[in-house]
């Protein structure tokens, strides 16, 4: 560590990926040793398992798994992976519940949480699309994520999972995924001011189906007169930052556009892909949200 701890290219230390609870004491010990050797100048990081892992393997339920990690390992953030888009569609029965648990536990501990999008195809996950990247990342942001990650950049050097067409693919060339991620990042950076250091006020769902962990929207957010979508529904998140509220409505489907009808009782603006605030006309407004995409609005508290 003495050779690298002052290097300008060093951001932090990666402890390990997807540990079981039995490893937490050892990881806590290693974290403390690294902090002492580093002088506390760089963050430490590891990534947790998703919620569909069997509770027998975890030796506890998922909420307790996250809670134990926070209390025992004591890292500055909570990171987890869950890739909801498979060849069979979106794994909605677990994904939203996973996000809700991680949001609640990290919020209770006063820690930010980080989430992933899948940029590398492997069994049973298809090639990424703009729709799948938007769905994963904007949904995470709606749940309060403060860090976004991609799995992975280079094509992993293993045949176990049939990894292929990573942003830097198996031939060490830029793949189509590279340019999708590049476009996604540009879009995210333009709108980052909405999400960075914002606080979640409420998270709810609208639509015909309510999945595990989803809370149906019963009361409209402040200053919202009406809000409705088609049967596929959406995630509806209210964020606050300074004197502004941000209403974030994320599609829950990759199959078709989501029709959003919304009316505000005060002046409101929509945030376009370039991050510009465009004032809305008074009265009801109708939007067609592309598959996996988001509609973002701002209005004063």
What are these regions (language model features)?
Residues 1-266, 272-301:
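Glycan-processing catalytic domains of CAZymes
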